[in-house]
Amino acid sequence: MSEESDSLRTSPSVASLSENELPLPPPDPPGYVCSLTEDLVTKAREELQEKPEWRLRDVQALRDMVRKEYPYLSTSLDDAFLLRFLRARKFDYDRALQLLVNYHGCRRSWPEVFSNLRPSALKDVLNSGFLTVLPHTDPRGCHVLCIRPDRWIPSNYPITENIRAVYLTLEKLIQSEETQVNGIVILADYKGVSLSKASHFGPFIAKKVIGILQDGFPIRIKAVHIVNEPRIFKGIFAIIKPFLKEKIANRFFLHGSDLNSLHTNLPRNILPKEYGGTAGELDTASWNAVLLASEEDFVKEFCQPMPACDNLLGQPLLPEGLISDAQCDDSMRAMKSQLYSCY
């Protein structure tokens, strides 16, 4: 059996306190049952500082911090939900709390994206083939989110609808504990992206999207692979680079039309034939069905009125470290120069 076959895995359908400060917690209650394999438990321990024997103690510590510091924050406090934030910040309580606050702050600060966020409201985007999740994970166990901007026709709906579809997909993926530990990989195909289409993704949109992905959502982005990027992508990347932290910027890989380069990172046996793979034609319908089957969950989470008292005592809820509006203006001018210089 080849090395690629051995690595093939099928995706599912879908600063801690010192150990001496608190006693060991009792066994996990029925409310939380760990679904991680032994290998993933080991990986979580080594990479995320997650210790099964302290897991519920850590969750309780974060829960207590939320209740004390943000008593009016309308958020789930169940074990499984809070674990997402602890894992995303390697069980550093303070950073996990900030991520949780940012998560809700981002949702409140961009109603065009987060209001009425449910699969049935995004059928046009889903049916366009703009995005899907490949049926197999990569050798590291990462889900592969495939995005194809050329499938978007701007006259049909605004770019924010695409962003809503991406966020919807991330919300579904992060429900899996496997994804919380392994993270995801993004494969973006920029074939056919024109100057007029690229101009819709300006610095103001980029600032918000990058802010959410880096500071406002509990997911680990392990790599971003760009293929078939036209000359215009030099301008697109100039838009987003100022907002990227060095760690994530170093995880961008531009392959052009060199599929052999892509295959050194994503093996052929997990890729559809459109990208030189052996996993059949790209299937978008299966992932669409997964999302549409989750309609009720999204209605409960994103389609309920916000409690009047949920204002976090008037504190701002925007991710820290984002570039100012003045800098956005500078980026817009630079972006226009970059875009036109590509032609």
Swiss-Prot record:
Superkingdom of this protein's organism: Eukaryota
The keyword Mitochondrion is assigned to this record: no
Keywords: Transport
InterPro entries xref list: CRAL-TRIO_dom, CRAL-TRIO_dom_sf, CRAL/TRIO_N_dom, CRAL/TRIO_N_dom_sf
Region Disordered, residue ranges: 1-29
Domain CRAL-TRIO as annotated: residue spans: 118-283
Protein's UniProt keywords contain Protease: no
Compositional bias ranges of the Polar residues kind: 8-19
Protein function: May act as a protein that binds a hydrophobic ligand.
Protein name according to UniProt: Alpha-tocopherol transfer protein-like
